[in-house]
Swiss-Prot record:
The record marks D71 as: Transition state stabilizer. Substrate binds at R21, Q22, A23, G24, R25, F40, D71, Y147, S202, H315. It catalyses: uroporphyrinogen III + 4 H(+) = coproporphyrinogen III + 4 CO2. It is found in: Cytoplasm. It comes from Helicobacter pylori (strain ATCC 700392 / 26695). Catalyzes the decarboxylation of four acetate groups of uroporphyrinogen-III to yield coproporphyrinogen-III. This is Uroporphyrinogen decarboxylase.
Length: 339
């Protein structure tokens, strides 16, 4: 698989490409599948439809990897927190984590309840071409904790940060509990058939450097170390969004570092490129315009050259991006990097 070879810095015939949120609302096929499911959460839980949605971007765009269609919040959901998705607002937990007692009340072994995810993986792997990789994923302990403490997405993360500074032992207990679940969750994804795993630390930039390293990065390192110990042949990709200023403190046992669009690739390559393969980092809104897209691709390829790079966006696809431009991006990257 070209994608897996690239994760391990092996020679590839061209630079592989996939896109975060490549299965999404910009595709009419996705919207049809979602309509059939009835709701976003039901789409995640319906393995037949989730498989359909996972495969759509591979078939339509020609990307080199599929990423499992699911949501990072299925883990806290199965740990016992009631989750709903409010239209135009996003995810909302009906209960929140406020103290040690509420951390202790979370169910252990939630990963055993996620058979709908593992079924999606095995179905997708059966239908996916052998040359194409399937990526599994989860959210980072810190990012999941913020949703569980705030009850929803936040601009200030005030409740989470208040806990971090005034009751660090409560937050640590939650992060520890989540880490153990996530290790087993990703392990079962691997056993079900994924070829690589990715951990999304979407709210990494909410923390100052020392707090980030202690309350997020340390847990990411713990998870990736255990996964590499168990499955050395499976690439681990970490994507901590918005920590470009902390790159000099990044270390650990993983294979690929996801670079967001706000972090200059030149800096990421200089600091991390010798040790990790870099993934990224086209600004997603460049896909609105073909000239802007071409310019962005040119800049990235000039910096990264032929090896140690997986092409991706620096954040997820937006719902109204033109699908023909997404397809053009894949063709352009393949054509420009073919060797």
């Amino acid at each position: 698989m070209i994608f897996i070879d690239a994760c391990f810095r092996k020679e590839t015939p061209y630079t592989p490409i996939w896109m975060m949120r490549q299965a999404g609302r910009y595709l009419s096929e996705y919207q049809e599948s979602r309509k059939k499911a009835g709701s976003f959460l039901e789409l995640c839980k319906n393995s037949d439809l989730a498989t359909e949605v996972t495969l759509q971007p591979v078939e339509i765009l020609g990307v080199d990897a599929a990423i499992l269609f699911s949501d990072i919040l299925v883990v806290p959901l199965e740990m016992g927190l009631n989750l709903e998705f409010i239209p135009k607002k996003g995810p909302h937990f009906l209960e929140t984590i406020t103290d040690l007692k509420s951390v202790e009340s979370l169910k252990v072994g939630a990963y055993k309840q996620l058979n709908y995810v593992y079924d999606t993986i095995s179905q997708t792997r059966q239908k996916l071409s052998r040359e194409k990789a399937l990526i599994g994923f989860c959210g980072s302990p810190w990012t999941l904790a913020t949703y569980m403490i705030e009850g929803e997405g936040s601009k200030s993360y005030a409740k989470s940060k208040k806990m971090l500074y005034s009751e660090p032992e409560v937050l640590k207990a939650l992060l520890e509990k989540l880490s153990l679940e996530l290790i087993e969750y990703l392990s079962l994804q691997i056993q079900a058939g994924v070829n690589a795993v990715m951990i999304f630390d979407s709210w990494a930039s909410a923390l100052e450097k020392e707090a980030y390293l202690k309350f997020s990065w340390d847990y990411l390192k713990k998870i990736s170390k255990e996964l590499k110990k168990r499955y050395a042949h499976i690439p681990v990709i970490l994507f901590p969004k918005g920590i470009g200023a902390y790159l000099d403190s990044i270390d650990g046992e993983f294979d690929v570092f996801g670079v967001d669009w706000g972090t200059p690739l030149t800096a990421a390559k200089k600091i991390l490129g010798g040790k990790y393969v870099l993934q990224g980092n086209l600004e997603p809104t460049r896909l609105y315009d073909k000239n802007a897209l071409e310019e962005g691709v040119e800049t990235i390829l000039k910096v990264m050259g032929n090896q140690g790079h997986i092409f991706n966006l620096g954040h997820g696809m937006l719902p109204d991006l033109p699908r023909e431009n997404a397809k053009y991006l894949v063709q352009l990257v393949h054509a420009k990097t073919r060797r």
